[in-house]
Amino acid sequence: SVGGGTQEVSQGLVKAMNYARDGETHIIGVAGRDGGALAIMADACVVVPEPADKSLSTPITESMQAVIWHLLVSHPALKRQKTAWEDK
C-alpha cells in the first residue's frame, strides 16, 4: 500500500501486520503520504514525503520502495548468496 493502509481499505495489510506482531517478528516498511497503519504498527517505517504534485505520490513512493528494498537485499550482512552478476 503506497499510503501505508488503513483498517478499512487495506484489511489484508493490517491483518498481515497483526499476524507478524503475534508471531513476535519485526515489521519494517516504506510508505508514502502519512504512512497510515504501517507507520503506526511498524518497528521501523520510512515515510516518503508527499510531493507537491500529488499525482506523483504513487510513482515516487514505489520508486523509493524499490531503492530501499534493493539496498536491504544487497547489503553484505543480509545476503545469503551472491547475485548472478557477482559470479562473473
Language model segments and positions:
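Basic, amphipathic alpha-helical segments enriched in Lys/Arg and hydrophobic/aromatic residues
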Residues: 88
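Glycine-rich phosphate-binding loops that contact phosphosugars or nucleotide phosphates
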Residues: 1-85
